[in-house]
């Protein structure tokens, strides 16, 4: 496979520049016959989750295609699902650059992107043009300048706009790069948000005559007490699924490595064990009443199987995809 050569060239570039260049090329081919260049045949291995049938258990995690620009090209690589976003009601530039860093020796990434995106209306227009035949998840968040106490309004605005076009909606309350966002994971703030989201979901179901499941994406840095509380809230509010996990603030496994001191969320292999442990504990708390989508450091078939053994129904990749490329998709789907 050609990817090791592509990676070598891309890794000569600044990480965000490499991402932009790759997406430039994918945008050129998406929806054209040139998509054949990235198309991979993978076996069909249907999995039912949140009332939806996924053609295979592997998805692309949110954050790579924030604006839904390359849905068809990414879909052609063999993913059973794509989660686009995180998208916010209004466009925003995100944090200052540089804001994305490779930890090459650890096969990890640190990002402090800050929900840079072109806004929900732009994403919806891109989704309308796409022909992906898998499940499309749309991950939503709040604008940086929206006060946390009004944060739920941003989620409701996005829900309303994406509902008709989403296979499922992911609620991102766990990015470490939007000030105060993670406080929405706790106590009354979480209950208040989930009540509003569930009410909005019911209203939108009546309007659109279809039920779009909602999953909440959580952080890996929850203590035992917080994790029990989150699981309890998700069950009480009849949320449809949970995505575990987002990036970590923990640097214990990357001490002394180049870029390890950068602020932001750490993903990739250093997150693998931590996210798997959260999935295992969540699974014990949820007792099969709510499905888990496992994400965090999956870079091999074994790592994907570990997430499923811990209690995940579906798995997603992001950093592993950056380091291993499209062959990782085929490998995981074939052998999982």
From Swiss-Prot:
GO cellular component labels: cytoplasm; plasma membrane
Topological category with respect to the lipid bilayer: Peripheral membrane protein
Binding residues for FMN: 62-66, 86, 139, 172, 217, 245, 268, 297, 318-319
Top-rank taxon, per record: Bacteria
Disulfide bonds, paired cysteine numbers: none
Annotated function: Catalyzes the conversion of dihydroorotate to orotate with quinone as electron acceptor.
Protein name as it appears in the record: Dihydroorotate dehydrogenase (quinone)
Source species: Salmonella gallinarum (strain 287/91 / NCTC 13346)
């Amino acid at each position: 496979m050609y990817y090791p050569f592509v990676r070598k060239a891309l890794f000569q570039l600044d990480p965000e520049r490499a991402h932009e260049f790759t997406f430039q090329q994918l945008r050129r081919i998406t929806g054209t016959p040139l998509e054949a260049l990235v198309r991979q045949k993978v076996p069909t291995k249907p999995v039912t989750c949140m009332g939806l049938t996924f053609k295979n258990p592997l998805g692309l995690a949110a954050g790579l295609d924030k604006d839904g620009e390359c849905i068809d090209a990414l879909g052609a690589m063999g993913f059973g699902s794509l989660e686009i976003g995180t998208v916010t009601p209004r466009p925003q530039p995100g944090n200052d650059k540089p804001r994305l860093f490779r930890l090459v020796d650890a096969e990890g990434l640190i990002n402090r992107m800050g929900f840079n995106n072109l806004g929900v209306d732009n994403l919806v227009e891109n989704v309308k043009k796409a022909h992906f035949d898998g499940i499309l998840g749309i991950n939503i968040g709040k604008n940086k300048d929206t006060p946390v106490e009004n944060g739920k309004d941003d989620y409701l605005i996005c829900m309303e706009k994406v509902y008709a076009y989403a296979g499922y909606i992911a609620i991102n309350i766990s990015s470490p790069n939007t000030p105060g966002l993670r406080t929405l994971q706790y106590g009354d703030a979480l209950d208040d948000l989930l009540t509003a989201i569930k009410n909005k979901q019911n209203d939108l179901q009546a309007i659109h005559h279809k039920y779009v499941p909602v999953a909440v994406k959580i952080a890996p840095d929850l203590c035992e007490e917080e994790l029990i509380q989150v699981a309890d809230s998700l069950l009480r509010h009849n949320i449809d699924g949970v995505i575990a996990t987002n990036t970590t603030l923990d640097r214990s496994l990357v001490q002394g490595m180049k870029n390890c001191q950068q602020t932001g969320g750490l993903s990739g292999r250093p997150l693998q064990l931590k996210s798997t442990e959260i999935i295992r504990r969540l699974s014990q708390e949820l007792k099969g009443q709510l499905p888990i989508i496992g994400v965090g450091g999956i870079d091999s078939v074994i790592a994907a199987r570990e997430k499923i053994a811990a209690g995940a129904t579906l798995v997603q990749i992001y950093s592993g995809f950056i380091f291993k490329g499209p062959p990782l998709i085929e490998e995981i789907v074939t052998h999982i």
